[in-house]
Each structure stands twice: as C-alpha cells, then as structure tokens.
Amino acid sequence: MATDTNITLVLTRFPLAVSCVKTGKTTKDACWGRLFVVAGNLASARFDRAGPDRATDGKTVEVTTRAGKRTLHLVAERGEIGAVREFDSLERAGGFVHLEANTDAVPYYPLKTEINFRVRDSFEAGGVKDHNGGRCFRVLKHPNKRSDGVMAGILVHEAPHVGWLTGCIAPGKRQSDRFGDSSRRAMNEIFQMMGGFAADKLARLIVLDKGEKDALKACPKPDRAV
C-alpha cells in the first residue's frame, strides 16, 4: 500500500536559462532552474503576494531563484509546512518533454517512488560508480504522451549532467554546466526528508511556469556531433 510522505517538490524555470553542454562526442541543450523541496502536503505554491483569500493561511519563505531572492507563498492542504530545501534543477531542452505549469484545475502532479532499473543500468553501463541504484520518483497523471499515445515516462532522478536526461528532471548543485555527484546527494537528501526511501511512497510536484521546450535551444543543432 502506498504511503504519503508529506513532501512537495516545487519547480521553477523562470527566467528561462539554457546552455550547450558537451557530453562525449555530442552537445546537448540543458535547461536550468530551481527546485524547492517542502516538508508538507501543499495545495498551492506561487510567487505572489498573499491576496485576501490567502492572507491568513499558509507560509511565506524567501528562496533564491535565477532572478534573485523571491517570496514563495505556500498553502498546505492539511497539516503544517516545515523546512524548505533548495536545489538547482536540470532538464533536457531542444524539443524534449517538459512538464506544463500546474493550474487551479490541476494544482499538482502526484509522485510515486520506485526503483527504476533502466536508470540504474544506464549508470552502471556508463561507468558511474557512485549512484543510488535507480531510486527515483515517477511523475503521475501528467498530459505528456508518447507517439503511440501512452503517457510518457517522466522521472525525478539523479543526473551528473544533461546527457543522462531525456524528459526527466534532476536536482543538484550546478558546477559550471554539470551537477557531478551533487545530484546523487540531492536525491538522498530528499529521501531523508521523507523518512528514508521505500518503493511506492507518495509525494507531490508543483510546476510554477512553462518550460517552452521547443524554443529552448542553445546548441546550433540538438545533439550535434563535435
């Protein structure tokens, strides 16, 4: 039976920032943002002043974005709102899948923990010695479809650099154009916030802004050989 972890991930890509990253013999488009991990089941998160309907509930926190310090207003669905941890976020750009921003009609995307063997095996095949064995979150109930009409597989998992991503999201600490081992450590910090990793734990993801996936291209051509 799935258990609720009382954790919400909040993703912002504003202002849009891309870079062209050399990975082996190719270059790949990277989209950088910020990921805030909140202890609490959030009903909403937004960058604005608390209006009359939100003035007496929730919590405001100062977070660091690519636009500098901003006030993030958080409202819990139930219970209290606890600590907030901040990470950089990394996604693949240049036409790859990006989750759309959440709306009042769809306030968040459900997440479920899993051990993904494709992620694990790709790290082992790529010679990455230190990884967390494919432990990740799967994004549920999102609108992105594959060409055959099946819901696309979007994960939140570790990634040393953008070459390990297609439509997925990785947290970490940006070091030039890479995360390095900070991505594995970031995922482990998130798992610690939810009381340790176990499969089928539930969490939430709130996406604050649109990714503009088709417009995000820093390389002359996606996956250009160099």
Give residue ranges: language-model regions.
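Cell wall/extracellular polymer interaction/catalysis modules
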Residues: 1-181, 185-203, 210-226
